[in-house]
C-alpha cells in the first residue's frame, strides 16, 4: 500500500475517501517527506525526549530545533537485603550532567544549552539546536532539596518524578505488590519537591508516574506540567499508558502530552504503522485539545539502535524486552499479560521521523496550524512559560 502525500489528499477526498481511510506507508517502506522548505521554515520541530548522540551530525540531520535531552546516568546500588538495584543517583547524575554540559559547550556552532525557554528561539536564530537537560527520575535528589539547586546550576531544566517504579517522592506506573499493580499517591516529600521545582523554574515531567501521583502533582503545581513521553491507555490498556483523566488534567493545567515511539505501547496491531502513531496523537487531541498534543521519541535521534542493526525486524528486536516483560506479567501488572510482537514503527525508526510525522498528520486531516502546534509549537509554549 503506497504512502499518500497531502498533494494527492484533495483528489482522494473528491473520490469519496475519508481522512480516516487514507493509507499510510506499510512497515519497511521509506516514504520521502513532502513538507516543503517554506512550510518547514514556519514550523518548529521539538522532540519531547531523546539523548545526546555519539555522532553529533545526527542532530543536524534530524532537523529538530530543540529537544528535551535525558542526561541521566544509572548506578548499581546494593540494597540492605543484599540485592542489587539500579538507580539514577545524585553522584552518577551529577557526573553525567557535567559531562553533557562540557560536550555542548565544545560545539557552539551546533548546540545551545537552553537555560530559559527563550533560548530555543535564540538557538534557532543562530542555526543551533537547543537542548533542555532532563533527568528521568527524582531519585537523583537524595539528601536534600538543595540538590535541586545544584542540578539547576548545572543546567537541569526538566525533572521526571519517577522512572517505572516509585521512590520517596511519587508512585511509579509499574509499582506492584503481591496482589498486582498498585496506584500510589504523591508523598509528603513529593509535594515539597513539586513546590521546589515550581520555585526554581524546572519543568515537572509525569512520565512513568502512577495515575494517582500524576493527579496529585498536577493539582499541587502552580505551573503547567508535562508528560514528556507516553501513550493513551484508551488505545493500549497498559500500566505504562495514561488514562484519559490524566491526559485531560495535564491539558487543563496548560501542559502537554508527548506521544513516544515505543510501538508496543502505541498499538496492539501485529504490524505497527505510522497511522497507529497518528491515532495516538488524534486521541490526545480529542481528550485534551490540540494545544496538549506533542511529539516525543524515547529512543536515540536516529532510532532504536538494535532494531536498526536488525533492519527494523521487529520479530527479532522484540526478544530483548521479553524477559523484563515476563517478570512484570508474573506480578500481574496491567497489560503485561499480552506479550508484545514489535518495538518500533519501522518507517519512523530513523533520523527523518519528524518530517514524516509532519506529512502523516497533514495527510490525516490536521490543519497546517494544528500540525505546527503538534510538531513543536506546544512544546515551545510550555517551555517558554515554565523554564
Go through each PLM region and give its residues:
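N-terminal hydrophobic targeting/anchoring segments and the immediately downstream early-domain regions
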Residues: 3-23, 29-180, 237-247, 251-252, ...
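Divalent metal-binding pocket/active-site signature
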Residues: 140, 153-240
Amino acid at each position: 500500500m503506497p504512502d499518500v502525500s497531502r498533494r494527492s489528499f484533495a483528489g482522494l477526498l473528491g473520490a469519496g475517501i475519508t481522512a480516516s481511510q487514507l493509507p499510510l506507508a506499510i512497515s519497511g517502506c521509506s516514504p520521502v517527506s513532502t513538507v516543503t522548505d517554506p512550510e518547514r521554515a514556519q514550523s518548529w520541530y521539538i522532540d519531547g525526549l531523546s539523548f545526546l548522540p555519539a555522532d553529533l551530525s545526527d542532530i543536524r540531520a534530524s532537523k529538530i530545533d530543540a529537544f528535551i535531552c535525558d542526561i541521566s546516568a544509572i548506578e548499581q546500588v546494593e540494597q540492605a537485603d543484599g540485592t542489587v538495584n539500579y538507580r539514577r543517583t545524585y553522584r552518577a547524575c551529577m557526573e553525567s550532567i557535567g559531562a553533557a554540559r562540557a560536550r555542548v559547550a565544545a560545539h557552539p556552532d551546533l548546540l545551545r544549552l537552553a537555560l530559559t525557554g527563550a533560548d530555543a528561539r535564540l538557538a534557532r536564530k543562530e542555526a543551533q539546536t537547543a537542548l533542555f537537560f532532563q533527568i528521568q527520575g527524582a531519585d537523583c535528589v537524595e539528601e536534600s532539596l538543595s540538590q535541586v539547586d545544584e542540578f539547576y546550576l548545572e543546567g537541569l531544566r526538566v525533572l521526571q518524578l519517577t522512572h517505572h517504579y516509585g521512590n520517596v517522592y511519587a508512585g511509579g506506573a509499574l509499582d506492584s505488590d503481591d496482589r498486582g499493580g498498585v496506584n500510589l499517591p504523591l508523598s509528603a516529600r513529593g509535594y515539597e519537591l513539586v513546590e521546589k521545582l515550581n520555585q526554581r523554574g524546572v519543568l515537572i515531567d509525569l512520565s512513568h508516574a502512577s495515575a494517582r501521583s500524576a493527579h496529585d502533582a498536577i493539582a499541587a503545581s502552580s505551573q503547567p506540567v508535562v508528560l514528556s513521553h507516553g501513550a493513551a491507555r484508551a488505545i493500549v490498556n497498559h500500566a505504562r499508558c495514561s488514562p484519559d483523566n490524566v491526559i485531560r488534567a495535564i491539558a487543563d493545567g496548560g501542559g502537554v502530552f508527548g506521544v513516544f515511539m515505543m510501538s508496543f505501547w502505541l498499538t496492539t496491531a501485529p504490524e505497527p504503522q505510522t497511522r497507529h502513531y497518528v491515532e495516538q496523537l488524534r486521541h490526545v487531541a480529542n481528550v485534551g485539545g490540540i494545544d496538549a498534543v506533542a511529539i516525543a521519541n524515547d529512543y536515540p535521534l536516529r532510532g532504536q539502535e538494535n532494531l536498526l542493526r536488525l533492519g527494523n525486524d521487529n520479530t527479532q528486536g522484540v526478544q530483548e524486552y521479553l524477559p523484563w516483560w515476563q517478570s512484570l506479567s508474573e506480578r500481574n501488572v496491567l497489560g503485561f499479560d499480552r506479550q508484545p510482537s514489535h518495538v518500533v514503527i519501522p518507517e519512523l525508526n530513523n533520523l527523518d521521523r519528524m518530517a514524516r510525522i509532519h506529512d502523516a498528520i497533514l495527510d490525516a486531516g490536521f490543519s497546517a496550524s494544528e500540525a505546527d502546534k503538534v510538531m513543536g509549537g506546544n512544546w515551545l509554549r510550555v517551555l517558554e512559560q515554565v523554564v
